[in-house]
Swiss-Prot record:
Name recorded for this polypeptide: Biotin synthase
Pfam families: BATS, Radical_SAM
Family under the similarity heading: Belongs to the radical SAM superfamily. Biotin synthase family.
Keyword Glycoprotein part of the UniProt annotation: no
Catalytic activities: (4R,5S)-dethiobiotin + (sulfur carrier)-SH + 2 reduced [2Fe-2S]-[ferredoxin] + 2 S-adenosyl-L-methionine = (sulfur carrier)-H + biotin + 2 5'-deoxyadenosine + 2 L-methionine + 2 oxidized [2Fe-2S]-[ferredoxin]
Residues where [2Fe-2S] cluster binds: C61, C96, C154, R221
GO molecular function, one term: biotin synthase activity
Annotated binding of [4Fe-4S] cluster, by residue: C17, C21, C24
Function (record text): Catalyzes the conversion of dethiobiotin (DTB) to biotin by the insertion of a sulfur atom into dethiobiotin via a radical-based mechanism.
Biological process (GO), any one: biotin biosynthetic process
EC number: 2.8.1.6
Pathway: Cofactor biosynthesis; biotin biosynthesis; biotin from 7,8-diaminononanoate: step 2/2
Length: 279
């Protein structure tokens, strides 16, 4: 019986991003009806961290909108990380703040951040079809920098953007070269406000993506994230049988997730336990 690791997301800043990622509701290039705000207060962030830990999460990811981790974001995320660590919540802290220099990443690590999340999103060859304002190489270099300063690396991406199987294999091979500790797996859900004209993945195709990810990344924490509820509904057991061993608990960046208690009950009904320690 395997233990399922739970991670919660805190959307520290929302919307207004100048990048043109075709899958992203936070891009200012598209008219998407989402909640927009500059920055949550430290009190709100700490309260979300407490709720996440009480719900069973071991990971807590601090996410900011925008292309990169500038000096102001570095200082604020560092302050938030210190507050959470000082509260003794025993959470594995992840920061997700875009492209970053080694100096900024080292500062986060010094202040209590354990891992950095920066998704490759898709294959290098396919990336120009979904984003023109920055390069895939910039993403890969940030992942390398996170590893170089001693942070854990969390990097994955989105299936169902219009890519084919050859691009999926290329993407998974690129992830393999980074040996990430954690790999978020998302399924794109079509949104009429975004420019991508694709259909949602069928369940079997989505499952094959998970099986391949597990084959390429046998020791990674494979974390199912956005799109699982839309693609699978309550019939999610095959995801875990295909190799998923971690779940994003609660809400996502701009969309609602299931209630944490419902997801935990569902996971246990499949015969799995909830992880009680990071390892």
């Amino acid at each position: 019986m395997k233990d399922i690791f739970l991670c919660s997301i805190c959307n520290v800043s929302s919307g207004g991003c100048a990048e043109d990622c075709a899958y992203c509701t936070q891009s200012a290039k598209y008219r998407v009806d989402i909640e927009k705000y500059k920055q949550k207060s430290l009190e709100n962030i700490l309260e979300e961290a407490r709720r996440a830990r009480a719900s069973g999460a071991l990971g807590f990811c601090l996410v900011t909108a925008g292309r990169s981790l500038d000096s102001a974001k570095t200082a604020y995320i560092s302050e938030a990380a210190r507050s959470i660590k000082e509260a003794g919540l025993e959470l594995h802290l992840i920061a997700c703040c875009g492209s970053a220099t080694k100096e900024a990443l080292a500062e986060l690590k010094k202040n209590g951040v354990d891992s950095y999340n920066h998704n490759l999103e898709t294959a290098k060859s396919f990336f120009p079809k979904i984003c023109t304002t920055h390069s895939w190489e910039e993403r890969y270099e940030t992942c390398e920098s996170a590893l170089e300063v001693g942070l854990g690396l969390c990097t994955g991406g989105i299936f169902g953007l219009g890519e084919g199987w050859s691009e999926r294999l290329e993407f998974l091979h690129a992830l393999q070269t980074l040996s990430p500790h954690s790999v978020p797996v998302n399924f794109y859900i079509p949104n009429p406000s975004l420019p991508l004209e694709v259909e949602a993945l069928a369940q079997e195709e989505a499952l094959e993506c998970v099986r391949l990810a597990r084959e390429y990344l046998p020791s990674a924490r494979l974390m199912i994230a956005g799109g699982r509820e839309k693609v699978f509904g309550q019939a999610q057991k095959p995801l875990f049988e295909a190799g998923i061993n971690a779940v994003v608990l609660g809400d996502y960046l701009t969309t609602k997730g299931n209630r944490p208690s419902e997801d935990i009950a569902m996971i246990r009904s499949f015969g799995f336990e909830i992880a009680e320690a990071c390892h």
